[in-house]
């Protein structure tokens, strides 16, 4: 089934790890007539050496690299939208960084979709995945707290518990 063409736009799909961002963003992009899926994690993986991982209480270098990743993602999505595409950007953008990301995207319209399943469901999904998003100091509960208590209510928030 094809979705109506929103025309050139940026759609940011965000949420905690294992909330369904990749699945939702890919499914949305596949249903649009002219769309790209901008995966924020690709920019993180481009760093070959010197990468500083974002963990609780991260050093300034990790935060700077995260903000660079967001800038690159926003610029890439905006460039595609500027050429007539619907750019579906997907990344973990939480807390005060969500408002900052919205400011980075110059293209309008910009749609923000926040996936917010219950923590127990996130833990179940994480356990069933081939990759691990948690660890290195993050727990499902800690990241869920950042989502629900520190992230501004921008865009459409969806409980994707199922």
Where do the language-model regions lie?
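P-loop (Walker A) phosphate-binding loop of NTP-binding proteins
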Residues: 16
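Conserved substrate/cofactor phosphate-moiety recognition/catalytic segment
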Residues: 26-72
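Hydrophobic anchor at the beta1->P-loop junction of P-loop NTPases
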Residues: 13
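ATP-binding Walker
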Residues: 19
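Conserved phosphate-donor/acceptor-positioning beta-strand/loop module used by diverse small-molecule
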Residues: 91, 106-126, 158
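Walker A/P-loop
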Residues: 22
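Glycine-rich phosphate-binding loop used to anchor ATP phosphates in small-molecule kinases
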Residues: 64-111
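Small-molecule kinase domains that catalyze NTP-dependent phosphoryl transfer to phosphate-bearing small molecules
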Residues: 128-162
